[in-house]
Amino acid sequence: MVTQVDCDAIAAAIDEAELTELALTLGNIPSRSGEEKAAGEFVHDWMAREGFSPRKVGATPERFNVIGTYGGLGVGKNLLFTAHLDTESPTRDPNLDVHKYSPASLADPEWERCWLEDGQLRGYPIANDRGPMSCFLIAAKALKKAGYGLAGKMYLTACPGEIGPEPIEEHSGIAFLGKDIGAHYLFHHGGVAPDYAIAAEGCDFGWTSVGCGYAVFRLRLWGEGTFTPLLRHPDAAGDHPNPIYRVGKLTDAIHAWTRQWEAASRFESTGGIAEPKVQLCAIRGGVPFQFGDGTEVVSLYLEVGLNPRQKVADVQHALEAMARAAGVGRFEVEPVVVRHGFEADAGEVAPLVGAVDAATRLGLGHAAERANPVYSSMWRDHNVFNMHRVPAITTGPRRWRPRPKDLADSALIYALTALEICGRAELGEAAKGSSVYPDNPFGA
């Protein structure tokens, strides 16, 4: 059991200024999805300097996972911390971004820059997810600095691709892989054997063992191409041969279906509340420079959140029924991306939740509460571990505009949690030397 003495000793070993500098330095390394190499190299080198024996394990040389280890000096449980190296941002391909972002959004410096202003850390890379990553790195350093050895192993992992992308349509192949080469790849090929896992992400110091998945569906409307001079317009747009004219009818139906689906999809368990959401994310139809005869096909792309109990087939059937009822003509519904949601078994994850609660009570003076439903209503990489029967939660500091103290508090909670889960061991219990000869090999 961790004590106030442990809390005070570890807190004294956490340098808030060092933690802030680490988060800012790491956050200011450009690391969009697909371009995580430089940030990964930085984390690897930091772990090496601090003595955490890092390794690189990746599906490609440019997008590797970094795995460091602290502890493993005796008999104890293993706790894995993970955070992602990539951060959401425009593609920076002007031919793509022009169809998604306004000029003002593209000019937002927080996509790729981080700084301290009025006591708050600004910049999306710190919020998601290199601030929490810095917290568990400093947590491991503080344990070591304060003289706490761990019986079990504390894995420190930094992954690419948690945000994405996803291979869809012509944007396919290895270059567009996301989650498949991050924590998924780490679990299968990273040489880790965790008893528990924490996805370190901003949760406002709450926790949840619930995670949503998602599916992206392509809803395709078919029609007829008509030479423009021969076109005769019907009275109703829904009867037009050009399927683009029927998009309005379909989006009205999708909007009504969305409200019903979201209400029916709310999910609550002891581990959290999931409120999965639905949103149209793209539309494609026709070839702008090849005009003159309209188009025969238009596609809408619909993102559908999935709670831990929902399956993609359920959504497929519901969307097909919706489109038939709407009378939109010939249509096709097909999932182009599928990732189910997961939750931890309440009994199996209880020791981890209890450790986080004890650490939070010592560090912050109050209990660790279930996180806001928004943090249970998205994909986070605790899903990967719960999928594979490793009890996992996501928990971490203030999500939006964290203060340096928030990061320091989170580092303390992570360190105390690791001490509770992994157990104590004397640092001197590590293996001595590596020579092939003992001290007195020949008895002289």
Named regions from a protein language model:
Residues 78-80, 121, 195-199, 218:
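Short glycine-aspartate micro-motif
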Residues 82-84, 157-159, 198-201, 220, ...:
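Short beta-strand segments
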Residues 76-155, 164-166:
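Active-site metal-coordination/substrate-binding segment of hydrolases
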Residues 90-116, 166-188, 270, 367, ...:
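Charged, glycine/proline-rich intrinsically disordered loops and linkers
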Residues 1-13, 17, 35, 49, ...:
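Metal-dependent amide/peptide-bond hydrolase catalytic core
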Residues 117, 139-157, 256-264, 421-429:
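Phosphate-handling active-site elements
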Residues 123-212:
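Acidic/histidine-rich catalytic neighborhood of metal-dependent amide-processing enzymes
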